[in-house]
Amino acid sequence: GLKRPQGMSEMRDAGKRWVNFPEIQAACGVKIVAPKLENAIAGTTLHLANTSEQKAEAEQSIREEWRGIYDKMPIMCSVCKKVSPRVEFITNCQNGTCKGAIEEKDGVVIKADTVGGLEALAFELFKLKIPVRQATVGPVNKKDILMAKSIQDPLNQAILGFSTKPNTEVADELSSDESEIAFFSGSIIYHIIDAFEEWRTAKQEE
């Protein structure tokens, strides 16, 4: 089924206020109800495949889409310590002035409910020259916490979530005052970034 929010309701706040549609136009918010969508990722391109060839083309397109997102993530060069999008790091550092450079295994963990949200959060972090160690769509889970704990720089031992929350397995751990990992989440990116920067400043003054 194809559903859109009723009236002026927002996608995230529609609750049970949804209206069925026989068809939809491009570039509109839509909720798709169908079987076997457990691994679908919100915000990605919707492909229609009626043949095996079309399916193969769609799969290749999806891989390229994810590759584009991967290349945009800000990372730190092991030699010059400059933070830049991964594709620029390869061009300017690995193949340029910093021969033998590798990607520093440092940076924050970011989460979002859609691919677009992930890109937006990564872009704001890049402007602050903060590297991203891992970026994935969906609720915060145990693997995300383990990744954040493995970061050596204490100023980057944090998880930033845009419009996403921890799953039930890790919710209590992240909300605890004794949590080893700082967790910042919300539906407004600038509020998340501001809270994160305040935490880093306080951390530096300890």
Model regions: which residues?
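C-terminal effector/interaction modules appended to NTPase cores
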Residues: 1-206
